[in-house]
């Protein structure tokens, strides 16, 4: 992707800000909690594996949550989240590395650093169990190569979630060696959400790859739809956070992590 290729202005602004942010200091070395193991444990316990996302705000959300992120994280885990995603992008999402550090120290589930990493030195900003690399952003001029970044991240101990949107991007992720792939239902060109995106792309992804459906998952029916299409886990932000101080984050998380299990639990109880 060069700078002339269509991309939503809000996303272009995020990309431009990511170019300006510097890297870390000393090279980090991480001993991560396993994301695939966390998903398997959740499924074995009768829960839908969900990565619950802590983001104070976003360009596509109304309002902002001022709750203590650690409190939110603990509520999400109590609600059954298998893992957490913490925004560290400061300019558009209100995130920070300090928040990630506090959350990771407070919970016993894997924590994803949700940011827009373009260069190797940006890996060394903060420790996390998982980092995000976005194929479309890494096609932009002046960014590091996806395969090189994937290798550099693994050398530091990170697990890597490689985000895609199209079949072509999935192919690039697989060619680079990705073993955890996310399919974003949101088109970064128009910001429109279509759950059919995941359904169209998922069949191209080998079974030995951990597959995560991202964006647009709001209801129990959406959860079932994505799981039926092959998602090993779901990354959910707005439907849990809702950017409303009155929203019950724990209840929202539980509603979605139990979306595919209520009928089973009811049957078992009745028996």
From Swiss-Prot:
Which E.C. number(s) belong to this protein?
A: 4.1.1.48
Gene3D superfamilies associated with the record: Aldolase class I (3.20.20.70)
- Specify the pathway: Amino-acid biosynthesis; L-tryptophan biosynthesis; L-tryptophan from chorismate: step 4/5
User: Its catalytic activity?
Assistant: 1-(2-carboxyphenylamino)-1-deoxy-D-ribulose 5-phosphate + H(+) = (1S,2R)-1-C-(indol-3-yl)glycerol 3-phosphate + CO2 + H2O
Q: Does the keyword Lyase apply?
A: yes
Q: Specify the superkingdom.
A: Archaea
Q: CDD domains in the record, alphabetically? A: IGPS
- What InterPro entries would the database entry show? Aldolase_TIM (IPR013785), Indglycph_syn_Halo_TrpC (IPR054875), Indole-3-glycerol_P_synth (IPR045186), Indole-3-glycerol_P_synth_dom (IPR013798), RibuloseP-bd_barrel (IPR011060)
Q: Which UniProt keywords apply?
A: Amino-acid biosynthesis, Aromatic amino acid biosynthesis, Decarboxylase, Lyase, Tryptophan biosynthesis
Q: Name one Pfam family in it.
A: IGPS
**Biological processes per GO annotation:** L-tryptophan biosynthetic process
Query: Which one of the record's GO molecular function terms can you name?
Result: phosphoribosylanthranilate isomerase activity
Alphabetized HAMAP family for the sequence = IGPS_A
UniProt lists the family membership as follows: Belongs to the TrpC family.
Please report the name of this protein according to its UniProt entry: Indole-3-glycerol phosphate synthase
Query: What is the native source organism of this protein?
Result: Haloarcula marismortui (strain ATCC 43049 / DSM 3752 / JCM 8966 / VKM B-1809) (Halobacterium marismortui)
